[in-house]
Curated annotation (Swiss-Prot):
It is found in: Cytoplasm. It comes from Streptococcus pyogenes serotype M5 (strain Manfredo). One of its GO terms (biological process) is regulation of translational termination. This is Peptide chain release factor 3. Residues 8-268 form the tr-type G domain. The lineage of its organism: Bacteria, Bacillati, Bacillota, Bacilli, Lactobacillales. Keywords: Cytoplasm, GTP-binding, Nucleotide-binding, Protein biosynthesis. Belongs to the TRAFAC class translation factor GTPase superfamily. Classic translation factor GTPase family. PrfC subfamily.
Length: 514
């Protein structure tokens, strides 16, 4: 198969949702269809000791939430599918947002009883910003939920995206009978031995069933007043195809996967800092690091840089340019994933995600190129932390482990590090409280370094250029610090303190990140 054909086979997407909407369960079912797992281990198995395949870190298994993004790959129906399962917990939005920079489409899982929730809305905004296609799976039809028409209306009103139902539920909860598949023009049956039936058989199968009569009315209404189906509008991110189903009972998931692969895009090009778009079909290899994860295997204190291949082909042992440092690196020890299990890979192409073993060479956002190509891809977004804690080692004899742990976890992007300009004290910044808990848990479990953490509360963070900085600007209402790149930054105690500073120093420019 030619390189072009290989690249065109790739489908790379992320699954996004609010916590508990069933995202990890649907990931399991997709892997099951891809033949990667023999049984779909649902997340509910906390007591039985069967954990979801994609939740691999110790703390995730204890809590039943995904706190890092897993990468999984399988072959299905002539396509090579790369799934990135992102953390649904709102405190992990940083890792999730960066992961969304490495995919060509998103699958949004919505709980039919709860509709669009806060975290889904936040993640959708990042996806919308990139103009990538969004496919919606409305989950948990095996339980009672909200009216399908109401859910579609909410998608359009809350997220501002037009929707088109690919199928429609016949009943819900105990009265759930199956799906009226508009796209494939058939019925998918929840009960009985037969999985499918023709639409013509519907009236006979569901004689006197009030839910089926309602479905026919709803569909008539949608055909008259709903949005038109448009493949181009889907690819442009302006129309979301909506699928109903139940991941827990594995109903409607395969139909979703088949249809998703029919319409999901091939690998996209990516923009460079100069505004050029690198074509995925270009023969020269290029890629960018969107995530760094330490200690994926606690037995080997390792670090892996996750790279999205943007163009060309990776071959084991190839030399690459690291544009940020101007130095070369050799990609000899490279892996692909199935959550915690991984295998060495000899080649991969545009659209694939590879893991490069890292001894401290790489940073999140790094561009890798070959030959004379020395461009850089557009930077990944940085997120401004909202809450802070002072941190120090509990045992001064463990300084070395403490510094190693902090350095690795900060490079991973799990937490942000700041140093007090005057005292040199370490301060950690996070988007949410859970990031601190995971940091503490991992420092103790993976680096054997107990830490003392003192809450500093919420702060308003702004960066300042070295040229504008005068240390006398520091006052009781702000803390002057340096970020991990040694850039000066002010941590203001609140918005009032920020406004007071801006009034006092009107010529000074303060910068805010995303």
């Amino acid at each position: 198969m030619s390189l072009t054909e290989e690249i065109k086979k790739r489908r790379t997407f992320a699954i996004i949702s609010h916590p508990d909407a069933g995202k990890t369960t649907i990931t399991e079912q997709l892997l099951y269809f891809g033949g990667e797992i023999r049984e779909a281990g649902t997340v509910k198995g906390k007591k039985s000791g069967t954990f979801a395949k994609s939740d691999w870190m110790d703390i995730e298994k204890q809590r039943g939430i995904s706190v890092t993004s897993s990468v999984m790959q399988f072959d299905y129906a002539g396509k090579r599918v790369n799934i990135l399962d992102t953390p649904g917990h709102e405190d992990f939005s940083e890792d999730t947002y960066r992961t969304l920079m490495a995919v060509d489409a998103a699958v949004m899982v919505v709980d039919s009883a709860k509709g669009i929730e806060a975290q889904t809305k936040k993640l959708f905004e990042v996806v919308k910003h990139r103009n990538i296609p969004v496919f919606t799976f409305i989950n948990k039809l095996d339980r009672d939920g909200r009216e399908p028409l109401e859910l579609l209306e909410e998608l359009e009103e809350v997220l501002g995206i037009a929707s088109y139902p690919m199928n429609w539920p016949i009943g819900m909860g105990r009265a759930f009978e199956g799906l009226y598949d508009l796209h494939n023009k058939r019925l998918e049956l929840y009960k009985g031995d037969e999985r499918f039936a023709s639409i013509e058989d519907g009236d006979q199968l569901f004689t006197n069933n009030p839910f089926y009569e309602q479905v026919k009315e709803d569909i008539e209404l949608l055909q008259e007043a709903g949005n038109d189906f448009s493949e181009q509008a889907i690819l442009d991110g302006d129309l979301t195809p909506v699928f109903f189903g139940s991941a827990l009972t594995n109903f409607g998931v395969q139909t979703f996967l088949d249809t998703f692969l029919e319409f999901a895009p091939e690998p996209h090009g990516h923009k460079t800092t100069e505004g050029n778009v690198v074509d995925p079909l270009a023969k020269d290899f290029s890629g960018f690091v969107f995530k760094i994860q330490a200690n994926m295997d606690p037995k080997h204190r390792d670090r892996i840089a996750f790279v999205r291949i943007v163009s060309g082909e990776f071959e084991r042992g190839m030399g690459v340019n690291l544009t940020r440092t101007g130095k070369g690196a050799k990609l000899s020890n490279v892996t692909q994933f199935m959550a915690e299990s991984r295998e060495n890979v000899t080649n991969a192409v545009a659209g694939d995600i590879i893991g490069v073993y890292d001894t401290g060479t790489y940073q999140v956002g790094d561009t890798l190129t070959v030959g004379k190509n020395k461009f850089e891809f557009e930077p990944l977004p940085t997120f401004t932390p909202e809450i802070f804690m002072k941190v120090s080692p509990k045992n001064v004899m463990k300084q070395k482990s403490f510094h190693k742990g902090i350095e690795q976890l900060v490079q991973e992007g799990a937490i942000q590090l700041y140093k007090n300009y005057q005292t040199g004290e370490y301060m950690l910044g996070a988007v949410g409280q859970l990031q601190f808990e995971v940091f503490k848990h991992r420092m103790e479990g993976e680096y054997n370094a107990e830490v003392v953490m003192t809450p500093m509360g919420k702060k308003t963070v702004r960066w300042i250029s070295e040229d504008d900085l005068d240390q006398r600007m520091s006052s009781s209402r702000n803390i002057l610090a340096k970020d991990r790149f040694d850039q000066p930054v002010f941590l203001f105690e609140n918005d009032f303190a920020l406004r007071w500073f801006a009034d006092k120093y009107p010529d000074v420019t303060l910068e805010e990140k995303m």
